Amino acid sequence: MRRTKHESLQEIFAKLQRGDMSRRAFMRQASALGIGGAAAAFLSQAAGTAQVATPGASPVASPAGEGSALALAEISMNPGSEQPDADPEAVVTINLGAEIDTGDPQVLAFLNEIEISSKVYVPLLALNEENLPAGAGAESATVSADGTVYTFTIREGMTYSDGVPVTAQNYAYAIKRALSPVVAGNYSNTLYAVTGGQAWREADPEGDAAELQVLEDVVSESIRALDDRTLQITLDFAAGYFPYVMAIWVTYPVREDLVEGNGADWWRDIANYVGNGPFRVTSHTEMQEWTFERNEAYFRGVPGIATLIFREIESSETELLAYQQGEFDLMGPAASQLPQIEADPTLAGELQRSVGASTNWFAMNNTAAPFDQVEVRQAFAAALNREQYVTQISAGVGIPAGTLLYPGNPAYQEDFQQTFDEARAQELLATAGFPGGEGFPSQQLLYVADDAASQQQATFFAENLNQVLGVQIEPTPMDEAQLQSLRTNRDPSLIFSTGNWFEDYPHPQNWLSLVFGPGTTRAPLGWDDPTYNDLVTQADQLPIDEAIPLYQQADAYLAEQAPVAFFRHGENLVLIKPNLLGYVTYPTTIVDTVYQAEKIYKTAG
C-alpha cells in the first residue's frame, strides 16, 4: 500500500527523535514532502522535547527527572447553603451588562463572558483569596525537576451537573482545543509554553493538511491523559507562571460529545452548555437574561444561592435605579456615578472600594523622532500630572500610576516610579534639544470622535503637556473603527495612543512579559529592549518567590526607560445589599464570583 504524506512525516520525525537522522536530512526530506520551512524548522527543534503520537503507541516516560509535589494552597469547604441564617430559596440578581459574543471558554475574551462561563465550569486549578494556586478540577499535581512536565491528578468523584464523570480526557480535550487554529481562541497565547502550542495555533487552518496534522500531533503528545485521573502537560521551557494559567478559563472542561458537530455556536443550546461548576444554566433569552440553578453535585458543597439571574442592562443609570429599587443585589457603578452615590447615605453605606488590577498608559511611538530619544519619553512621563488626572478626569476613581504593576501585585515595587516633576521634565526635554519646547514638532493626539470621555482625556493630556513642556499637541477626532485599525495594525503613523491592561491572572508574567516582553504586539512600536527582555525571560522560568526580584527590576527598568507614560491604576467600586453575605474578597476583587461563588448566600428579608 502506498503510504500517505502524513505517515511519511511521522516516520521521518520519529527517526529524527531517535537520532537516526540529522536535522539537515530531516529538513531536506520535509521540504521534499511539501512541508514549509518554518514548520519543518519548528519540528526539527521540537524533536528533542516532545514525542509525536503514533497509533497504538504507549506513553513515553519523561526524561525530565523525578517530579516533586506542586505546592497548592487550600480553599476551604464552607458553602453558603450550610450557614445557619441562609435563605434556602435565595434568588440573587446581578447585571451582566451587554449580551455576550461567545460562551465558549476556549474562545472568549471579555469579562461578561468569563462571568457566565465561570458559573458553569471549574478550571484545572483555582486561586485562593491570597491569589495563590489551589486545587480545583485537579486535587494535586507534581512538576518535574526541570520544571517542564506537570502531572495533574483529577479530583476523584467529580461529575458534570448531568452526572457524567469528569476525567483527565475532558481537561486534555479542552486545553488542546484552546490551541487549535480552527477554534482560534483569543487567549491561546497563555498556553504557548506548551510544547508545539504556538506553532500549531499560528498555523494556517486552511494550509497543508499533513503539515497541520503533524503540528497537532506534537500538541496531542504534549497534552495527554495517561488515564482517567491523570493529565500530563509538557512545556518547552520551565514556566513558573504556568500554574496560574491553569486557573483561567482556557482550562474549562467543555465536553467533546457536546461540542463536536454542533458548530462554533454550540454553547447557545443550553443542553450543550453543561459543566462541573457551582451552577447550571436553566434558560437564556438573548439580550435579556441568563438564569442558573445551583448544582447540587458541586464538589465544594451545595451553593448558597438557589437561583442566580444575570440581567442585561447596558445603561449604568438604569442599572443604578434598578439597584435602588431592590432589583439587583449588587452592582459595579461607573466612576461618574460616585458623586451621586456618596451623596446618598444608603448607597454610601453599601459602597465598597478596592484597588483594581488594571493600568492605563500614554504610549509613544519609540521609532518616530523625537520619541526615539529616551530623554523625550522621560520628559513626557515626568510631565503628566497623574493626581490631577484622577481627580478631574476620572472623578476621583483610580490610583495615580507610576509603573505597570499595580499595588498588590506580588512584584509591585517603589524603587523607581514615574512621578510628576515639572522641573525634571523641562530639564530632560532641554537635554534632548528642545528647551521650553522650542523646535519640538507639533503632534496630533487622536481620540474617538463622538466620545466625550475620549475627547476629555485627550484635551487634558494636550493642555497638561503644553503647560509643563511648552509642546503643541492637537487633540484630533477620528472614527473609532479607523483608530482601532491603526492600533491593531501598529501603524507607524500613530505617534500617540492610550493603552491599558486588565489582569488575566495575578502573576507578573501576565503583565511584564505578555504586554512589554519579547515578541509582544501590545507595546509601542520600537520597544524591544534586550536588558528588559533578558530580565523577564529569566524570571518567567522561575518559581514566583525566586522570580519576584527579577520582575521588580524589570518593572523599575520599564518605568525608567519610559516607552510609555503610566498614569492610572484602576479601582473597583461595588454596591452590595446588606443581606448578601459570604462573598470572598481577593486583593483586587471585592466580591469573588469566579472561584468561590458557592460561599455567597442571602439572608431572608
Language-model features: locations:
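N-terminal secretory signal peptides
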Residues: M1-A25, A32-G34, A39, S44, ...
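Extracytoplasmic/peripheral linker and loop segments enriched in polar/acidic and small residues
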Residues: G80, D85, D217, R224, ...
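N-terminal lobe/hinge region of extracytoplasmic solute-binding protein
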Residues: N95-A145, N272-G275
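Gly/Pro-rich hinge or "lid" segments in bacterial periplasmic/extracellular proteins
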Residues: E129-L132, P205-A210, E216-V218, R224, ...
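Extracellular/periplasmic solute-recognition and catalytic clefts
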Residues: T282-E293, P303, I309-A368, E387, ...
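Ligand/substrate-recognition segments at binding pockets and active sites
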Residues: E286, A430-E503, P524, I544, ...
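Append "and occasionally in soluble cytosolic enzymes with long acidic Gly/Pro-rich linkers
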Residues: E293, D372-E463, Q467, Q553, ...
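Long beta-strand-rich cores associated with HINT superfamily self-processing modules
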Residues: V574-G605
